[in-house]
C-alpha cells in the first residue's frame, strides 16, 4: 500500500511538471504575427494611448498570437510617408489625420470642410453611423482598410502677434497649416497666407518668425509647447477633423476572417477609450495654457458666421460632387 501511494504521488508530480512545462512552452512561443503601428504624437498623447490600448486588446484576444508594436513620436516617418508605406505593406497599422489621407482619397475632403459640424456630438452622430462607415470603406481602393475614428478635437487659430477677434485680423497673417490643399485654401479664403510646414518644425518656425501663427487643437498646442511662442489663441472651431485608424490591405489579407473581425472590434473599442481620454486631456491642456498666460478669444456668433461665409468657396471647389452628402451630414444635427 505504501509503494502504491508513492507511485501515485510520483505520477501526480510528473503530470504536474508536464503541465507546467507545457504552459511555459505556450507562454514562450513566438507570436504568429508581429505588426508595426505608426503614430506621430508623443507617448502620453490620447491617440498614442488609444493605439496602445488597441494593441493590448488585440494581444489579449488573440491569446498572444498577434502583437502590435506602437512606435510614437514620428519614429516611422511623417504621416504622408506612413500612408505611402502602408499602401505597399511597409507599415501595418497607423493613426493618421484625415487631412493627410484626403490627399489619397479625395472624397474624404467632405469630412474636413470648415465649420461643418455644430459640435462634437453632431460629428460622432455622423461618424458612428452609416455615413461614417461608408467613408471608412472608401479607403479600400487605396490599398487601405479603415478601422475606426479617433477624436482630434476642434482646431483653432493661434499666433504670436495679436488677438484675432474679427475676420479683418486674419489679413496678412502667415499661418502654418498641414500639407493639405483644403487647409491651404481655407486659410487663404480667410485672408491669411498659408504655409505648409511639418508638425515637428512648427515651434521653431513660430520662434524664428517664419510664421506668425498656426492652427490646431488644445492638446497639440499644449503638448508641443506652442503657447511659449504664440500666446494668442482664438476659439473659432473652424475644423473638427477626425483621425482614422488604418491597416495595410496587404497586412489585412494575411489575417483570417475571425482575426479581421476581432481586430475591427478592438479598434472600435480603443476609439471609445481614446475619445474619453481626449475629452479629459482637452480640458487639462486648456487649463495649463491659461496658467501660462495665454490670451483666449472666443469669436462671437456673428463673427463666426462671417468666417463661415468667407470659406464657402472651399466647399464649391472640393465638394461640388458631394453636396448631397454634406446636406445629409448637416441634417444629422437635427435628428
Regions found by a protein language model. Name each.
Residues 136:
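Thiol/selenol-based redox catalytic cores and closely related redox-interacting motifs
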Residues 2-121, 131, 139-335:
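N-terminal secretory/targeting leader peptides
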Amino acid at each position: 500500500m505504501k509503494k502504491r501511494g508513492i507511485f501515485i504521488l510520483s505520477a501526480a508530480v510528473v503530470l504536474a511538471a508536464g503541465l507546467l512545462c507545457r504552459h511555459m512552452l505556450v507562454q514562450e512561443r513566438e507570436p504568429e504575427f508581429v505588426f508595426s503601428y505608426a503614430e506621430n504624437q508623443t507617448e502620453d498623447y490620447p491617440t498614442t494611448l488609444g493605439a496602445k490600448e488597441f494593441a493590448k486588446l488585440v494581444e489579449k484576444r488573440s491569446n498572444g498570437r498577434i502583437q502590435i508594436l506602437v512606435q510614437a513620436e514620428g519614429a516611422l516617418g511623417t504621416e504622408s510617408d506612413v500612408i505611402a508605406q502602408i499602401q505597399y505593406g511597409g507599415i501595418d497599422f497607423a493613426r493618421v489625420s484625415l487631412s493627410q489621407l484626403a490627399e489619397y482619397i479625395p472624397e474624404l475632403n467632405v469630412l474636413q470642410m470648415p465649420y461643418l459640424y455644430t459640435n462634437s456630438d453632431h460629428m460622432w452622430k455622423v461618424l458612428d453611423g452609416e455615413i461614417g462607415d461608408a467613408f471608412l470603406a472608401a479607403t479600400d481602393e487605396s490599398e487601405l482598410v479603415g478601422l475606426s475614428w479617433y477624436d482630434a478635437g476642434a482646431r483653432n487659430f493661434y499666433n504670436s502677434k495679436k488677438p484675432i477677434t474679427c475676420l479683418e485680423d486674419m489679413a496678412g497673417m502667415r499661418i502654418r497649416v498641414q500639407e493639405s490643399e483644403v487647409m491651404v485654401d481655407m486659410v487663404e479664403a480667410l485672408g491669411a497666407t498659408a504655409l505648409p510646414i511639418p508638425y515637428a518644425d512648427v515651434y521653431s518656425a513660430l520662434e524664428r518668425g517664419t510664421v506668425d501663427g498656426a492652427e490646431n487643437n488644445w492638446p497639440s498646442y499644449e503638448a508641443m509647447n506652442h503657447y511659449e511662442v504664440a500666446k494668442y489663441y482664438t476659439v473659432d472651431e473652424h475644423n473638427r477633423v477626425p483621425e482614422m485608424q488604418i491597416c495595410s490591405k496587404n497586412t489585412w489579407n494575411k489575417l483570417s476572417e475571425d482575426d479581421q473581425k476581432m481586430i475591427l472590434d478592438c479598434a472600435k473599442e480603443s476609439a471609445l477609450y481614446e475619445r474619453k481620454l481626449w475629452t479629459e486631456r482637452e480640458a487639462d491642456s486648456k487649463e495649463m495654457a491659461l496658467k501660462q498666460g495665454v490670451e483666449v478669444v472666443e469669436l462671437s456668433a456673428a463673427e463666426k458666421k462671417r468666417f463661415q461665409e468667407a470659406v464657402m468657396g472651399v466647399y464649391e471647389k472640393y465638394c461640388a460632387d458631394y453636396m448631397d452628402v454634406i446636406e445629409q451630414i448637416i441634417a444629422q444635427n437635427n435628428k
